[in-house]
Amino acid sequence: KTVVNMTHHMFVNLKGLTDPCPTIEDHILTVNANWFLPTDNTMIPTGAINPVDSTPFDFRKPKKIGEALACEDDPNIILGHGVDHNFVLNQKRQGEIIFAGKCVDPETKRYMEIYTTEPGMQIYTSNWHDGFKGYHGVRMPRRSAVAFETQHFPDSPNIGHFPSVVLSPGEIYT
């Protein structure tokens, strides 16, 4: 048996590349999730599955990313220095292609939609970027990009009630 949890870690800033890269705090985010995974102080999910209601993680209706980041008294925002959490997507059947989310830059009107067959989506707001040089030498300061990582839940092999990531001999990963 093999543990498989494929994802990607693409960063986006819908404003485009300028030096230094602007923040994504005014990007408007919608996420198709009623639940998220809180983490411990090492940013590993605790095993709890919490409702997004009345938390900074409630993106069920379009909301600026910066509104969540401004909730500096929320323990989950404090631990991650921003958003670095997995959202439990509203999926009716495992493997079904669903709308996971949408991100819009209100200034340029650029947007992206995310669709997936995975049960979760990790969202990371580049909380640890420190001005390193990225694509074309553009400086990437904190909050200069956002990543949308569709995947199974982090630490699934160690948390029995999370969806399985075990692939048995003869099974095909889809």
Question: Which residue stretches match the model-derived regions?
Answer:
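An exposed, glycine/acidic-rich loop-and-rim segment of catalytic or binding clefts
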Residues: 1-174
